[in-house]
Amino acid sequence: MALTLTDVKRIAHLARLEMADADAEHTLGQLNEFFGLVEQMQAVDTAGIAPLAHPIEQIQEVAQRLRDDAVTEVVNRDDNQRPAPAVQDGLYLVPKVIE
């Protein structure tokens, strides 16, 4: 799938973006490169390959760098709310803006 300059200008118009001709041509090149990459990926035969829920686990050197999500510091609510102009029952009070 290849886009034309008219397509890029129409998309910009629909997105309410003002785009100069030079920018539109540059964007056209980038989008066509992206769609070319997508076409290459779609051309790969993946029959018989089970999808991975978390593909990063298959790369050992990357997976080992990840750590468990654990609490590393304690947040003191009173200290954080002390500079607030208005607090009630541990909640910040803000002015009503919608009727």
UniProtKB/Swiss-Prot annotation:
UniProt KW Nucleotide-binding keyword: yes
Assigned EC number: 6.3.5.-
Catalytic activity as recorded in UniProt: L-glutamyl-tRNA(Gln) + L-glutamine + ATP + H2O = L-glutaminyl-tRNA(Gln) + L-glutamate + ADP + phosphate + H(+); L-aspartyl-tRNA(Asn) + L-glutamine + ATP + H2O = L-asparaginyl-tRNA(Asn) + L-glutamate + ADP + phosphate + 2 H(+)
Entry-linked InterPro entries: Asp/Glu-ADT_sf_sub_c, GatC
Keyword Ligase: yes
Alphabetically ordered keywords of this record: ATP-binding, Ligase, Nucleotide-binding, Protein biosynthesis
GO terms classed as biological process: glutaminyl-tRNAGln biosynthesis via transamidation; regulation of translational fidelity; translation
An example molecular function term from Gene Ontology annotations: glutaminyl-tRNA synthase (glutamine-hydrolyzing) activity
Lineage top rank: taxon: Bacteria
Physiological role: Allows the formation of correctly charged Asn-tRNA(Asn) or Gln-tRNA(Gln) through the transamidation of misacylated Asp-tRNA(Asn) or Glu-tRNA(Gln) in organisms which lack either or both of asparaginyl-tRNA or glutaminyl-tRNA synthetases. The reaction takes place in the presence of glutamine and ATP through an activated phospho-Asp-tRNA(Asn) or phospho-Glu-tRNA(Gln).
Subunit structure: Heterotrimer of A, B and C subunits.
Family that this chain belongs to: Belongs to the GatC family.
Protein name: Aspartyl/glutamyl-tRNA(Asn/Gln) amidotransferase subunit C
Source organism of the structure: Burkholderia vietnamiensis (strain G4 / LMG 22486) (Burkholderia cepacia (strain R1808))
Encoding gene per record: gatC
